[in-house]
């Protein structure tokens, strides 16, 4: 006759032996066996009753029990009180006490491990609280500090962008005004150039008139000289003719005086001389008057042409001076326009560089914000994982508590006193035969989590008959 006692702990299934690290699992099974039932046959033989505890996140239990089948090898045998061997009870009690002692030692070890496990859970809870406090502090400080810095820098960037935009608009307005001034000056320059060309053409025509007048004056001077020479020649010829006539008259007068009493020719000659002199004086006076009138006309035309030429020269000099002044102004405006365009290009380049720097700063701040968000999300995931671990640990603690309460209730049950066992005479033929059937109902509940979120949950029922 032998008694078998098998005891296993869910803590070992969960965490291994004394030197094995704890690894949580999503499905946990707990098996505890103990000697609780006895069957009567030809001799008193203990049988075992197994209780299977299967825990899942919902805490479901399945039991398997062995019924007692009473059989007798010899029909009609009677069990009498005198045929019972009470020494067997002492052996059973001794072995039961040893088993209880072993169970107490194992329960003490389990209690020590459970205390260590609770200390670890408390330490993890403290770490969880510290992480939560750090997370809240990071949320508060990071949001306020980075938000204020980001807003302040964005306001400064917007202010600088607005200032640069205003400067750019002002420079563009100045550039447009300068372009309009340049266009107006160019139009004025074109008009002045046209007027200059007209003045030059007028001056050229005046020069042609002056040349013509000079030629006419020279021609008139030559004519005057020729007329003077002709007058001198005619006068000389007239004088010679007069002398010849006088000589002839004297010769005739002498001859007449000598020959006959001649008429008085002196008066006739005097009259002829007077006539010729009057005609010569008249011709000379007319020639002088014509010459003087022509000379006066030519002098007046020359003076008029000289005045026009002088005025044209003055206008040409004035136009030339205006052209030089406008050319200097155009050159100065071109230099100013080039300097303004260069400044505008430099400002555009500086604005582009500053805008690129601001964009880089904004991108860097956004990356920092994204990193902070990712870090916060990581802390939240760790916190959720810790919460899941805590929930699993709470479930295991509750399971341990139920197991301990079951063990305590089982230990507190009174033991049967075999010395006072009263056996009655029983006819084994009249006892019904009870077959031993074991029914096992197993509920498997599987929960899959990812990043602290339940993504799948399944439940399975299994009914086995043995």
Curated annotation (Swiss-Prot):
In-chain residues carrying the UniProt-annotated modification Phosphoserine: 5, 7-10, 25-26, 34, 39, 42, 49, 55-56, 66, 72, 83, 87, 144, 214, 226, 299, 409, 412, 419-420, 430, 438, 459
Region (Tail): 408-466
InterPro entries, per the entry: IF_conserved, IF_rod_dom, Intermed_filament_DNA-bd, Intermediate_filament
Domain of life per record: Eukaryota
Region (Coil 2): 269-407
Record flagged with keyword Coiled coil: yes
Gene Ontology CC, one term: cell leading edge
Annotated positions for site Stutter: 351
Region of interest: Linker 12: 246-268
Coiled coil region boundaries: 96-131, 154-245, 303-407
Post-translational modification: One of the most prominent phosphoproteins in various cells of mesenchymal origin. Phosphorylation is enhanced during cell division, at which time vimentin filaments are significantly reorganized. Phosphorylation by PKN1 inhibits the formation of filaments. Filament disassembly during mitosis is promoted by phosphorylation at Ser-55 as well as by nestin. Phosphorylated at Ser-56 by CDK5 during neutrophil secretion in the cytoplasm. Phosphorylated by STK33. Phosphorylated on tyrosine residues by SRMS. S-nitrosylation is induced by interferon-gamma and oxidatively-modified low-densitity lipoprotein (LDL(ox)) possibly implicating the iNOS-S100A8/9 transnitrosylase complex.
N6-succinyllysine PTM sites in chain numbering: 120, 129, 188, 294, 445
Region of interest (Disordered), residue spans: 1-31
Cross-link Glycyl lysine isopeptide (Lys-Gly) (interchain with G-Cter in SUMO1), sequence positions: 445
Motif segment ([IL]-x-C-x-x-[DE] motif): 326-329
Compartment(s) of residence: Cytoplasm; Cytoplasm, Cytoskeleton; Nucleus matrix; Cell membrane
Gene Ontology MF term list: double-stranded RNA binding; identical protein binding; keratin filament binding; protein domain specific binding; scaffold protein binding; structural constituent of cytoskeleton; structural constituent of eye lens
Pfam families given in the database record: Filament, Filament_head
Its biological purpose: Vimentins are class-III intermediate filaments found in various non-epithelial cells, especially mesenchymal cells. Vimentin is attached to the nucleus, endoplasmic reticulum, and mitochondria, either laterally or terminally. Plays a role in cell directional movement, orientation, cell sheet organization and Golgi complex polarization at the cell migration front. Protects SCRIB from proteasomal degradation and facilitates its localization to intermediate filaments in a cell contact-mediated manner. Involved with LARP6 in the stabilization of type I collagen mRNAs for CO1A1 and CO1A2.
Protein name per UniProt: Vimentin
Organism: Bos taurus
